Amino acid sequence: MPGTPQKNKRSASISVSPAKKTEEKEIIQNDSKAILSKQTKRKKKYAFAPINNLNGKNTKVSNASVLKSIAVSQVRNTSRTKDINKAVSKSVKQLPNSQVKPKREMSNLSRHHDFTQDEDGPMEEVIWKYSPLQRDMSDKTTSAAEYSDDYEDVQNPSSTPIVPNRLKTVLSFTNIQVPNADVNQLIQENGNEQVRPKPAEISTRESLRNIDDILDDIEGDLTIKPTITKFSDLPSSPIKAPNVEKKAEVNAEEVDKMDSTGDSNDGDDSLIDILTQKYVEKRKSESQITIQGNTNQKSGAQESCGKNDNTKSRGEIEDHENVDNQAKTGNAFYENEEDSNCQRIKKNEKIEYNSSDEFSDDSLIELLNETQTQVEPNTIEQDLDKVEKMVSDDLRIATDSTLSAYALRAKSGAPRDGVVRLVIVSLRSVELPKIGTQKILECIDGKGEQSSVVVRHPWVYLEFEVGDVIHIIEGKNIENKRLLSDDKNPKTQLANDNLLVLNPDVLFSATSVGSSVGCLRRSILQMQFQDPRGEPSLVMTLGNIVHELLQDSIKYKLSHNKISMEIIIQKLDSLLETYSFSIIICNEEIQYVKELVMKEHAENILYFVNKFVSKSNYGCYTSISGTRRTQPISISNVIDIEENIWSPIYGLKGFLDATVEANVENNKKHIVPLEVKTGKSRSVSYEVQGLIYTLLLNDRYEIPIEFFLLYFTRDKNMTKFPSVLHSIKHILMSRNRMSMNFKHQLQEVFGQAQSRFELPPLLRDSSCDSCFIKESCMVLNKLLEDGTPEESGLVEGEFEILTNHLSQNLANYKEFFTKYNDLITKEESSITCVNKELFLLDGSTRESRSGRCLSGLVVSEVVEHEKTEGAYIYCFSRRRNDNNSQSMLSSQIAANDFVIISDEEGHFCLCQGRVQFINPAKIGISVKRKLLNNRLLDKEKGVTTIQSVVESELEQSSLIATQNLVTYRIDKNDIQQSLSLARFNLLSLFLPAVSPGVDIVDERSKLCRKTKRSDGGNEILRSLLVDNRAPKFRDANDDPVIPYKLSKDTTLNLNQKEAIDKVMRAEDYALILGMPGTGKTTVIAEIIKILVSEGKRVLLTSYTHSAVDNILIKLRNTNISIMRLGMKHKVHPDTQKYVPNYASVKSYNDYLSKINSTSVVATTCLGINDILFTLNEKDFDYVILDEASQISMPVALGPLRYGNRFIMVGDHYQLPPLVKNDAARLGGLEESLFKTFCEKHPESVAELTLQYRMCGDIVTLSNFLIYDNKLKCGNNEVFAQSLELPMPEALSRYRNESANSKQWLEDILEPTRKVVFLNYDNCPDIIEQSEKDNITNHGEAELTLQCVEGMLLSGVPCEDIGVMTLYRAQLRLLKKIFNKNVYDGLEILTADQFQGRDKKCIIISMVRRNSQLNGGALLKELRRVNVAMTRAKSKLIIIGSKSTIGSVPEIKSFVNLLEERNWVYTMCKDALYKYKFPDRSNAIDEARKGCGKRTGAKPITSKSKFVSDKPIIKEILQEYES
């Protein structure tokens, strides 16, 4: 494996902070050999040396269990441990000479962020890598909100959520190494590349060009490209990359001279050494420049740049100022620019041209060779010019199109000063003496302007690709804002403080980036594979309690002179009551937890709050990290608690424990983050998180954040951590490296080609032995990376234990996993790529495009929420001067929707809330934040004041004035989560299995429990699905697996009885294919009754809550014990009694008894992360999966893991799983597990064909479309049913006699007409309207309204009518039309939403009618049409254009059937005006009203410019004017 040269050898690798002088080499060499000589098996755990308390003495490593510190001076003379391993094993290599670089000075970064100078940096630290014997739990990690059953709860998760007990934090520091790269090899490879510059315009040449040159241009340089070292092959930090040469060699005199100055790093390097495992080595001498071409270009632009034979040595380039000046023009370090083939990329030279097959043929060369003597040279030259011009024109067109797309991608919804957003259009790599590797990125901005960005150490180690988005946060130390490096300004000696963020539109949490420091692979796997199995953790629960106790205590102290222990105990008791259930499921007593908090935290919190939460900093001495100094710092105010900040500038997000105002020396106030930790461990990830919080605050408030405060509740004092430029750079490097694994979430993947799923390399460290995701990591290593025991780094035999089960069918397993993992990734790209729209579109643009946003808002009123303590209702209205604003009802935001509130200056997610009400002029949002805008800018004084959200003293009038210093936007919170749960479900097929019933002891709680099959991999499903093992059934002559007897008076038909018998004889699984209306729910309820009567436990699950509840409603009159998991407001009122109430649970045994005695547990497929599934003593005997044909295979695998046998019920002739990505759909993701098993093993299927829903005519349609006459009516009564009209004569009163049209409404409502296609081809006024992706048809909406009005006036109840459409824009229009009390009970849904439901009468609006006869793509899916038709019981009315709908080939024969049966009713020209119903016009007007007259403004007409792109409003105005 790249970067993992060791084989089962371990060393105690070290991370050191720079400090003092270089000393003798021999000592550390001997120590390294001693370490290497140790055996792999460790007899004693390593102890953790104290931090910030180490002296730089010459201390050798002893064999004691505690590894003592080694002086930094000794460590500096060592090479990396893995190089020593090679040296020892081969006994041929010598350690490289060390190098000490001159000390750098630190400078402030930019207006966005100020960084502290060297005096606040740490002194000397030596930290040993170790593997703790017991799990070392962090006190604060972020739980995944995705797939949470209650979406509301995940909108504002705590920064200290409960984390599964088995997930443990392992402190480890990476020390990854790759073999040295041979620079000569790079030069040789580049020399083989034929590359030429292409001019911007091709004109007649003065002389004949070589035909090879022309062919090369035509073919697009189809030569072998030099390879760029993959990032996975690089070390964990750029500092230690051995294949890239370092700065100039330092001679002995310079070393002696610099001994007194220490290392060159700026400020605090304790974090940097952990991030980078820093080392220095002697650089090879180099006299030539190596230029690498880009090999990673995805599309469009590609630059060709080659090496001239006459390339001159640039060893003389030493002047950094000269280098910087050259870089500004994009021509830095080019060889002999007048004569070199490597020239600067022109605007039109960045597209890769793939020639056709004929251009690749040699026939053109042969032809030219044969005719060369017969044709005049100028004729050949003219012909060649024509070819070149043709190619050039094609290139220019393609390039312009690509560049336009890139420029669009580079636009930002809210540009910021000092932040530049660019898209890479081409790139190249250059090897320079005394500089090392340099990459030159040709970029384009949102205005279409191109520029060059020069990237050096450390940013050069990122794998840039064409099309990547970068943010440059401009600093102030270097004049060239397009140079990203560690170089110093030669005049001021200040370090380059420009920062780079790669793929900034993916936001990573501070916790994720912090954990990546120890192991990048582990962090990536946790994010991409969400394991729903978790165990309760007392440590996490305790951390939550202590966090909230400290936060409450701080808030109390702000308004009181002192806090007493009595107050703390009072607050603690309240918190213990809140967390009582969490404590109980940890098998602990509440009193014990209280004593623990009082013993280990309460006294410290009391001392800390009384001493440090004070207006004055007198006596509040705070230690400064990395130094022996202290500084008076107090917390004079608290700005916010649990502040949630999203930063699309830095590509980061996080919850801050507290944002505080710190009073430092000379009463200078600073806004800084206060990070609270409650555990015993001291992890470098805490420092990473804290520094990330400084960046987040810098983005939110646009002020310098110079440090952060860290407080451990087990201590009485806090520590100040200065914000250091070098540390910030490497934290962003870690974040940027993570982003490369999630690029698919930014752009939708369209191609069907399978992409490679790459992971960071194995850490191969001692911490791997106790890693909580070791099984997943090694299985993936085997499936994706052809892993071997030697490369795993695990103790001997362990890799085989974890992966040997894959050997029996490894090739098939690899193919299966790779295929479906790729399909999940493609689908994930389509789901998540829309997330960035929130950041990249300004509010008005997003509102006009999609309606998912309301823009230009101001606060009109703020009131406290009457029902929810600590909540407020913010009322928003449009700006007063905005006369052109649309009605808020025109948006897609509705009551009870979750929304995100941001300001229009680029500060996103100020808070999240739920819509309380919305009307044309106002919208009310319930939030838990008192102030939205607490940033007050005095432009005259140039001072920014930050108001406290916790203790705001503003009056109502001042509050609103303060809030309206900015304008707001409200976005519908449809941020899509990744498919990490589905990806883990797929992986679980290949994890090692666990034998059930084995006694195991939990290492933390010491409790003994028996294993369950669900604790390991899903071996049974793997054999059935991947190995294609056929399911087994008991023979009809044998007794069934589950003995049963049906009652004599049962109403079940023969089909249903056969289906039940199939289930009871199944040894693995059974499938029930239930056609529409055939009683699937009844059969499932009967099966549950039989299984429970035989003592079996059942897990009932489906994709939707309604499907689960429909089955439970049929069981409500039984004595079966049922537990319905889910939030009450999502559960049907009739089944809410089954939602568990744990108030009666007083102990851990009470809880176990309650869940283990429950016969039926019901939940959705995505609700399987409940703690019940972990604490269950046994898995379920049966899992019943309803709606199985609508669930994609990876999602269905989740609940099936928890049962010994399973039953799937569905109909794959109805709606398939919803798949957004076309490539994923065509690749097979749309094929459900139900359909797969139906087709592979039809003997496992029981069909239900007798239906009791639809009349005979409607069944005819369904049989014609799908079922080939298999579907039958259950009895004659069902066959002959019709829609009854109690008062049909009422319609005559509403006829418009002036209209010549016949009384079409009475005709189509005639009860004998059970299927009607209402064809309006003769009505010219009815035509579709298309606005971007929104397709509506107002004429059809009016016809639908008249049909509903006609039925209501004829006596048909609203509850018996359903309105359906296939288009969501039409759905919104219909809902607005019927938004009146008189239509209560009328359901208006899409075909997908109507699945599983039925009505006596269904009206379908087909929408499409246009002159092009384009019927659209939705009708091509016959399964969707089938669902639409089969929702009706006794009457089906289809409103559409026969000519347009009939143009769809897939549906043409269906239209012909309607004509043959005389079911098409063609309307007359003026049919729209035949009836006039009461309040009809008012309903339409209110639904469509998008604007009204404004006082003092010119009236808007249908010819106004304002409505030119608003066809709905334009049509309304035309109706008014007519």
Curated annotation (Swiss-Prot):
Locations listed in the record: Nucleus; Chromosome
GO terms under biological process: DNA damage response; DNA double-strand break processing; DNA repair; DNA-templated DNA replication; lagging strand elongation; meiotic DNA double-strand break processing; mitotic DNA replication checkpoint signaling; replication fork reversal
Residue(s) carrying Phosphoserine: S17, S237
MF (Gene Ontology): 4 iron, 4 sulfur cluster binding; 5'-3' DNA helicase activity; 5'-flap endonuclease activity; ATP binding; ATP hydrolysis activity; DNA hairpin binding; DNA helicase activity; four-way junction DNA binding
CDD domains hit by this protein: DEXXQc_DNA2, SF1_C_Upf1
Function: Key enzyme involved in DNA replication and DNA repair. Involved in Okazaki fragments processing by cleaving long flaps that escape FEN1: flaps that are longer than 27 nucleotides are coated by replication protein A complex (RPA), leading to recruit DNA2 which cleaves the flap until it is too short to bind RPA and becomes a substrate for FEN1. Also involved in 5'-end resection of DNA during double-strand break (DSB) repair by mediating the cleavage of 5'-ssDNA.
Protein name: DNA replication ATP-dependent helicase/nuclease DNA2
Gene name per UniProt: DNA2
